[in-house]
């Protein structure tokens, strides 16, 4: 059932954009035009264990980027590790795309300021153009496409590929409505994924209810 719900995610998003716009044209823009800044990070020298011992600075790796809100990291580093590497602080609410290996194409949102390694593309969204959660959902919807762009033995992508990715940019009011609906849908999906077996039937009924609400959503534009 969970796979069915996830497969419907992209269909819902595309259908909602069309329904909410009611036939209006929508511009597709590259992430490089939607972002204030797109950056990557770095890795402090692993040969200097002091950089990693008793650290307090969150340092994100791509295995922690998995279509999620990120409130903490498994590894912490110290300030000299930041200063002596390409690791850089990013503000909260960047949209992060994993660029390397098995995790390529996965996206997440950092909910606290943190640093990242070089395999993360960190998108600081210009919120005069787009809501960061809207950008997140657009990129999550393009996961298979982004993954297909990978090259080399590890199927990596790079910052230039990320900057050229295009997403539809409807008015901010429409973006807000889409985010509100997809946040509810995402919460439901997570509940199904994490629920005990005896709860699955109840969750399925809830899913069917929200599906009906989504398909009958009436927008005020």
Regions found by a protein language model. Give the residues of each.
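A short glycine-rich beta-alpha junction/loop motif
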Residues: 100, 114-121, 153-171
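Sequence-specific dsDNA recognition surfaces
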Residues: 34-48, 63-92
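Short, structured motif recognition centered on aromatic/hydrophobic residues
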Residues: 26-31, 35, 57, 90-91, ...
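Short, recurring structural edge motifs at helix starts
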Residues: 2, 15-21, 46-49, 153-154, ...
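Specificity-determining recognition surfaces
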Residues: 50, 138-167
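Non-catalytic DNA-recognition/assembly elements of restriction-modification systems
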Residues: 19-42, 199
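Amphipathic alpha-helical segments
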Residues: 1-6, 10, 25-26, 166-204, ...
